[in-house]
Amino acid sequence: MEVPKANVPLEVIVVGKKLHWLGKRAVLTIIEPGIGGMAAALTLGLRGHHVIVLEAAPKLMEVGAGIQVSPNMLRLFDRWGVSDLIHAQDVALEHIHVRRWDNGKLLGTMPVNKTFGQQVVIHRADLHNAIIDRALALPNVELREDSTVTDVQFYPASVSLANGQIIRCDVVIGADGIKSTIRDHLLEDSTIKAVATGDAAYRIMLPRHIMEEDPALKKLIDEPQATRWIGPSRHIIAYPVRKHELYNVVLLHPDSHGVEESWTTKGSKQAMVDNYDGWDSTVRKLIDLVDDNEVLEWKLCLHRPLKTWIRGSVALIGDACHPMLPYVAQGAAQAVEDAAALGVVLSAISSREEIPHALSVYERSRKKRAETVQQSGSENRVTLHLPDGPEQIARDAQFKASASGNNPDKWSDRRTQEFLWGWDAEKAALDTWNEDQGQIRANANL
């Protein structure tokens, strides 16, 4: 499927994210490593715009974590020619098993709903590299590393770099994450900071060879399935990636670091062991395999919904405007939907003077949906982390009866899946644009 070309090719700047250094390991400061920004560069590049991506890092680094590529995201990558690169490295899930925290008792097995397409999982670096490779293969997309943005102008658009350079353009896209510099300038409010949710996550990646020695662990990495263990104030999600050569494990738990500013910290192996003391023996086996120096802990943060995502010829996308908790696996997907919507509206204009108006259509197309998805993640956290007791017993009974499609875990619930996975961000943006143009024509005839 050929991507439609823009009526007016624009000069677009995409501002990426900063890195925090942890010894010899570099970890991006937010959950998704520049996926939204690179997706914006790709879709705009395919439509004929000239795109410069500015990354603050001197070199893009691999981030050791997995990601779920949900159908609403994969649908867009299909159109943009990235799917073959993704499928060369992914695992297509067939089932998700939900187990009790202490004894591993199976609470329910849900087949993956393929009504809206495949649900695949992949190493974040493999996904990021697939998008980068596809984008940078275009002659009109370039990536400039070691380019830290310190200021932005809104109309006409430009960015100032730490080295004193000023780059002028038609549009600036702020894809610089939950600690966004562009957002602070856009809102003229530096008080909108990430707020700790009280949760944190360990993310570990285990190589196949160390799991093959135990038959139970070998089965986990061999099968095209995700496993979720749920318990009081905690849960774990795990699945194979990189064609079953790595096993991704995310362990969510109460944050013990208080108001510490760092988004990512080196974690303690002993603290991880203590956090999951008394959990299923399979969980403890997985934790035992983790190298003492490979424990990284992510603080899960949000900020309150913004009054606006746009100003002049500047727009925010992804975690810069709607950071997501990982409980419905939509953080990267919503950033990619933002990118898709921008690609549509910026390619529909007939003159540069329409850019601010196009961005207002982008916001109308995206803001309510993204913030609704954001809220659904927060709600799912409560369900998954119930303490043992009457509510937990009732929830577990629902898992057993979930063959009907109604599921207490929103990720596996059919109605929630239809809302999340059935959405076509490009169609929604085009519909919003066409409705807007129809209203403009109607008003002109009054």
Region locations from a protein language model:
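Accessory recognition modules or surfaces
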Residues: 2-13, 26-28, 56, 60-72
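C-terminal helical "tail/cap" subdomain of flavin- and related membrane-associated enzymes
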Residues: 2-10, 26, 106, 285, ...
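Conserved mid-domain beta->alpha element of the FAD-binding
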Residues: 9, 14-24, 30-57, 173-174, ...
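Short glycine-rich hinge loops at helix-strand junctions in the catalytic core
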Residues: 48, 81, 140
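Active-site-adjacent segment of FAD-dependent monooxygenases/related oxidoreductases
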Residues: 62-134, 150, 230, 384-386, ...
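Short, flexible helix/strand-to-coil boundary loops that buttress conserved ligand/catalytic motifs
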Residues: 64, 80-81, 90, 110, ...
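Conserved FAD-binding catalytic core of PHBH/FMO-like flavoproteins
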Residues: 97, 103, 130-292
